[in-house]
Amino acid sequence: MKDNFEFRSINPDEVEQAIAIEQICFPPNEACSPKAMTERIAKVPQLFLVAVDKSTGKLAGFLNGVATDEEKFRDEFFTDIDLCDVNGKNVMLLGLDVLPEYRGQGLARELVYRYSQREKANGRKKLFLTCLEQKVEMYKKFGLQDLGIADSTWGGEEWHEMVLKG
């Protein structure tokens, strides 16, 4: 599987692909807005990890976040890129997106693993994310710890806050 993909930071000309993938992977109440996605890619492309299908040259999925010294996930991270401190000791993961045709092949796990290794090498201490109840077990298999119900009410949903310690 790994040999079929190139893993790297996102390129500015891939913003439209990222927006389209986000809208496929998340319902409208949870998806990142095109404006916020464009701002994230413009400001911190290095905090994206994309998986490019070598056979098509197109994005198959990606993981993105914002760096901060904060230790608690809050909804404003989704919408306010100015909260990002590129030198922050932690990363708040904002979205793990894998197109449906690439699911079930271990790509999500590979993205989380490679992202965590890269950010650990960059001096990050912890990765945080929020997820719905039905995704908790998947993220536990990826090595994250469930911290319980999050303060987040993003999209009108109840979320679990999870952490991966470096």
Report residues per predicted region.
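Conserved catalytic-core motifs of GNAT/GCN5-like acyltransferases
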Residues: 67-70, 128-130, 140, 145-161
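Conserved acetyl-CoA-binding loop-helix of GNAT-fold acetyltransferases
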Residues: 98, 104-117
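Active-site rim helix/loop that mediates acceptor-substrate recognition in acyltransferases
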Residues: 27-55, 62-83
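Conserved GNAT acetyl-CoA-binding A-motif
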Residues: 112, 118-132
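Short hydrophobic/aromatic beta-strand element in the GNAT-like acyltransferase core
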Residues: 46-50, 62, 95, 128, ...
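Residue-level recognition of the GNAT/N-acetyltransferase active site
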Residues: 11, 99, 132
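Conserved acyl-donor/pantetheine-binding loop and adjacent beta-alpha core of acyl/acetyltransferases
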Residues: 58-96, 103, 153-158
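A short beta-loop-alpha structural element at the N-terminal edge
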Residues: 4-18
